[in-house]
């Protein structure tokens, strides 16, 4: 009975419509949406076991090119993730420079490295191999392997 009196008073003051609108908004907000799982439980799980500790033997290939045309074969070996030592001592200087430019571009494009081991001898390494040359830094810092000027 007291609820009816309050409803009538709220109706006279104009509050009843606001209460109904608030209730409708709450009801609209609580509308449940059907959620579909990203992975259904009915699908078969394809677990693939991959060995993390694989013993892959690194292969080093030593090449002494006779012409510039062998540059493509050398870079194909680098693409196959092999370490290549290239000896260009028998090539003319201009041809050796062209070969070196080609190999340098290929190693850069593949993320590898090209280092000079000795005069006219280079090592091409893929991105998975780190080449350090500590001997070269020692030579630069001490101006020779043996420091005779003490």
UniProtKB/Swiss-Prot annotation:
GO biological processes: division septum assembly; FtsZ-dependent cytokinesis
Gene3D superfamilies, per the entry: SepF-like protein
GO cellular component, one term: cytoplasm
Superkingdom in the source lineage: Bacteria
Main subcellular location of this protein, as a coarse class: cytoplasm
Cross-referenced Pfam families: SepF (PF04472)
Subcellular location per the Swiss-Prot or TrEMBL entry: Cytoplasm
InterPro entries (UniProt xref): Cell_div_SepF, Cell_div_SepF/SepF-rel, SepF-like_sf
Complexes and interactors: Homodimer. Interacts with FtsZ.
Family in the record: Belongs to the SepF family.
Protein purpose: Cell division protein that is part of the divisome complex and is recruited early to the Z-ring. Probably stimulates Z-ring formation, perhaps through the cross-linking of FtsZ protofilaments. Its function overlaps with FtsA.
Protein's name according to its UniProt entry: Cell division protein SepF
Lineage: Bacteria, Bacillati, Bacillota, Clostridia, Eubacteriales
